């Protein structure tokens, strides 16, 4: 059985849990609150920190940071119901398949969440949207773990 809890990240949800089950916000509410520009600013802030990060920075190809930023922004806009561009250009997200070549353990998950949390704080993502995004990001980051001991 896979352990999905981590004391540091209180928002790791049990398997099948949904962010909206712990808050009143949903995808449409996040988009109303943040808008596409807000989501893109948040993602840009995240990627400003990636190259200098000693743990997850090496997972990203420096030459493709712009592409990675665009893919994450498009994925989030798709997942939040604002756009189908991601689906039209990339197909099904297949997140585990797309990340399987990277060793992602607890440390990597937590660092990714730290950088995303910093990006949300830096760009002023409103508390109401954070109520949805915090557990959403924690759930996705934990889902991508492929190293039990890390």
Predicted regions and their residues:
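Core of compact, soluble alpha-helical bundle domains
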Residues: 9-150
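Extreme N-terminal basic, low-complexity initiation segments
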Residues: 1-10
